[in-house]
Curated annotation (Swiss-Prot):
Pfam families: Pkinase. The keyword Metal-binding does not apply. GO terms for molecular function: ATP binding; eukaryotic translation initiation factor 2alpha kinase activity; protein serine kinase activity. One of its GO terms (biological process) is cellular response to amino acid starvation. It is an enzyme of class 2 (transferase). The active site is at 479 (proton acceptor). It catalyses: L-seryl-[protein] + ATP = O-phospho-L-seryl-[protein] + ADP + H(+); L-threonyl-[protein] + ATP = O-phospho-L-threonyl-[protein] + ADP + H(+). Residues 36-88, 155-234 are annotated as: Disordered. Keywords: ATP-binding, Kinase, Nucleotide-binding, Serine/threonine-protein kinase, Transferase. This is Probable serine/threonine-protein kinase DDB_G0283065. Residues 236-629 form the Protein kinase domain. The keyword Kinase applies.
């Protein structure tokens, strides 16, 4: 059992234990490895203690750590790097990271990677605020405080000194907002008074507030195996989730250099240069408009998938972070079946992405030997993402290269139009509009918004202004929904984002010409339009059916959004039923006669936007004059 601690936890530990007159005390990091039995004491690093064959934990006195820490950094770093036996012994170890925040977890993961330690399982636990003092009291007599090990990471790469160990005194923020720790269960052993590994059972009076979530440690850390080379981990902190779905996951985070907040979108890809996903990047890079979410940059990072990591496409990120109860842009379903040979264990899908599933095949010949493999199925490609083999507790690792595309964008702090509409359906004015991630408005005051007819018109007008610009640059968005329209200013500064389904007008035109002039079979047409693309309630019939279409399809979506804002549905079922009816009838009068009577001019404009593809106007044919919107004469020369 190898035990360590880190600088971030030391500072919090010292502050919490000051009331108890317990100098430097903190949580430990345990390495429980079956190969440690034969280790010699002389071959161990001086900064670790081996307790595999002893019930009593050996400790190292660090009372003078604050004065001697700087002198021992280089020695400790050399001991870690040069001790090959320790590295080999840890190859099949179970590592439990016990820490205060995700930055602490990342730093310790850096240490493992920097030391050349390869492990088969990494688990972590986060200690809640309420339990820290009690835990400190219980662990005071036995936990090792080896701050120098974590500090050695600072000296391992002088050029990256500031990037790898940025703490910024944000520990209190991390306690509330950071990555949730993970482990199947937890225990506080009365005899050894140490936090056990992830697989132990919960058993202690002081463990009431030890937080743990189902085993997702590999997911939270598999992107950090080469953390020193991760731009995202080195340049951003205060990470929390804004939303997620089939497209990937979007984080709110703070850049450690300019101290500005950004939205960073992460998309898992199978190749280093993902042509399809880069369409979104290229679209955003070419667009510069006040009503479009600003693009700052993008990059690709390589990750290592091991035998304990979750399936590449089946990643369930809502276990990794706190306060992400709902994201309306995605839906998830889970199916499980017991069978001796195979089972379909998960399925993740949404209205604008292909279904992707994780397929598990299990077989066993005896109680002591079993194997399993999982495969990622998506877009017609099959790739192995996980294989495990258990033979008398010996694990074989399969490492496979995967990549993540990161897109750094402007952060819209107030809300999405979806959240705004949902709130308005229940109350006519909103106090302090916040997104699903509870982002307070930047000026710290309440925002009073009433979604009256004037506001509905202004939102619609700004969306059309943005679409005019997008279309003029040769792009079609294809997914204009309330979820992709962001409220970035008070009272209403509307911006369009999420260009994940954007394509060029030229590609749609080429496809149309191929189908009409050459009678090419759609199944063999590489540029063919896919039916069902987009979000069903907001996509036009021609786009839904995969017929020939162009930038006019975005105008149908705008008409539906305008209709929804005026209708103010009280339930999700009412919204779904009514918008489906509008999609079939293409008439406000046939869908909601009362609304037609209440807002005759506005509903006439909606009818103009949602009419059939052949007669629907282009965006540059619609007047967006502020004083005369919606226009009475719908078309302009």
């Amino acid at each position: 059992m190898w035990k360590f601690t880190s600088s971030a936890t030391k500072r919090i530990g010292n502050s919490l234990s000051s009331n108890n007159n317990n100098g430097s005390l903190l949580f430990s990091l345990n390495f429980n490895g079956s190969n440690n039995n034969n280790n010699n004491e002389s071959s161990k690093p001086i900064t670790a203690a081996n307790t595999q064959n002893n019930s009593t934990t050996k400790s190292i006195d660090n009372n003078n750590n604050n004065t001697n820490n700087s002198n021992s950094n280089n020695n400790n770093n050399d001991n870690i790097k040069n001790n090959n036996k320790f590295n080999r012994a840890s190859h099949r170890s179970n590592i439990t990271l016990v820490a205060i925040n995700n930055k602490d977890i990342s730093q310790m993961t850096n240490l493992l990677a920097d030391s050349g330690i390869s492990v088969s399982k990494i688990s972590n636990k986060k200690i809640s605020l309420a339990s820290k003092i009690n835990t400190l009291n219980k662990l005071n007599s036995s936990l090792l405080h080896l701050n120098s090990i974590n500090n050695s990471l600072t000296n391992s790469n002088n050029n990256n000194d500031n990037n790898n160990l940025i703490d910024n005194n944000n520990n209190d923020n991390y306690n509330n907002d950071s990555i949730s720790s993970s482990s199947s269960s937890s225990s506080l052993s009365e005899s050894s008074q140490t936090l056990s590994s992830a697989s132990s059972s919960a058993s202690s009076s002081s463990s009431s507030t030890l937080s743990s979530s189902s085993s997702v440690s590999s997911k939270s850390l598999n992107n950090n195996n080469n953390n020193n080379n991760s731009r995202f981990n080195n340049e951003f902190n205060d990470v929390r989730v804004l939303g997620k779905g089939g497209f990937g996951i979007v984080f709110q985070c703070c850049n450690i250099f300019d101290q500005m907040e950004y939205a960073v979108k992460r998309i898992k890809v199978n190749q280093k240069i993902p042509t399809k996903e880069l369409m979104e990047v290229r679209a955003m890079a070419r667009l510069n408009h006040p009503n479009i979410v600003r693009y700052y940059g993008s990059w690709i990072e390589e990750e290592i998938i091991t035998n304990n990591s979750i399936d590449h496409y089946g990643e369930n990120d809502n276990n990794l972070f706190e306060n992400i109860d709902s994201f309306p842009s995605s839906s998830y379903s889970s199916v499980s079946a017991a069978a001796s040979s195979s089972s379909l264990v998960s399925n993740s899908s949404n209205s604008y992405s292909n279904n992707k599933a994780t397929y598990i095949s299990n077989s066993s010949s005896s109680s002591s030997s079993s194997s399993s493999c999982s495969y990622s199925i998506g877009n017609g490609n099959l790739s192995i993402s996980e294989c495990t083999n258990d033979d008398n507790n010996n694990y074989n690792q399969l490492k496979q290269k995967k990549f993540s595309l990161y897109i750094q964008m402007e952060l819209c702090k107030y809300s999405t139009l979806r959240n705004l509409i949902n709130e308005i359906n229940n109350i006519k004015s909103i106090t302090s509009i916040q997104s699903t991630s509870s982002i307070a408005n930047p000026i710290g005051t309440n925002i009073l918004i009433s979604l009256d007819i004037k506001q509905c018109r202004e939102i619609t007008r700004q969306i059309l202004v943005a679409l005019k610009y997008i279309h003029s640059q040769g792009f079609v968005h294809r997914d204009i929904t309330p979820d992709n329209v962001f409220v970035c200013q008070s009272p209403f500064g509307i911006k369009i984002g999420d260009f994940g389904l954007a394509t060029t007008i030229e590609s749609l035109t080429v496809d149309s010409n191929n189908n009409n002039n050459n009678n090419i079979n759609n199944n063999n047409n590489n540029n063919k339009k896919v039916g069902g693309l987009g979000t069903y309630l907001y996509s036009s019939n021609e786009q839904e059916q995969g017929d020939n279409y162009n930038q006019k399809t975005d105008l149908y979506s705008v008409g539906v959004i305008f209709f929804e804002m005026l209708s103010q549905f009280k339930t999700t079922m009412e919204r779904s039923t009514t918008l489906s009816k509008l999609k079939k009838s293409l008439s406000v009068l046939k869908t909601n006669p009362n609304l037609k009577q209440k807002y005759p001019n506005d509903t006439d404009f909606i009818d103009h936007l949602i009419q059939s593809f052949a007669t629907r106007p282009f965006s540059n044919q619609i007047s967006t004059d502020y004083d005369n919107f919606p226009p009475k004469n719908f078309l302009i020369n």
